[in-house]
Amino acid sequence: MQGLRWVQLSDAERDEFLGDGGTGVLSFATTGDEPPVSIPVSYGYFADADTIYFRLSVPDDSRKKSLVDNPISFVVHRETEAGWRSVVATGRLEAVDDAPYESAALQGLWAVDIPTVDVFERPPSEIPYRTYRLRPDDLTGRKEVDSKP
């Protein structure tokens, strides 16, 4: 890619890029020689606490049930008017469905907007969901800049 170089997003640029919710790709670590399990998901982002929330479908036959305790990475990327942007977060998911109402975990959830994307052949009311949060061990963003003279 001639003429392009990457630089880090500032925290403010990262927060603006993530907004209060959108879509990205969540990847779960696996064992042995298996590739990571990657799924497109909706997310909500609470910038005040650098916390990302997910509402994941977990039907009985879901492989996610056996993977949610594994390390994860989460990626959001898209082209903006100012060029390409991406954010990568890593860490472990924490279930928040059973957290007390007054807990920081649930209070942060009320501040985000997790988009509803219907990708199933059944009505959403028939699908079990669990809510998780990610307080990233690492949260970085990059942006494209024009390096032409």
Segments the model singles out, each with a brief description of its role:
Residues 39-41, 72, 89, 132:
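Hydrophobic residues positioned within well-ordered beta-strands of beta-sheet architectures
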Residues 3, 84-149:
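Charged, gly/pro-rich active-site loop segments
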Residues 57, 68-79, 84-94:
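Active-site-adjacent structural patch at catalytic or cofactor/ligand-binding sites
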Residues 60-62, 148-149:
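Short, surface-exposed beta-strand-loop junctions and turns on beta-sheet-rich folds
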Residues 21-59, 74-75:
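Short beta-strand segments
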Residues 32-35, 80-82, 123-126:
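A short beta-turn/loop motif at secondary-structure boundaries
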Residues 63-67:
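Surface-exposed connector loops and short turns at secondary-structure junctions
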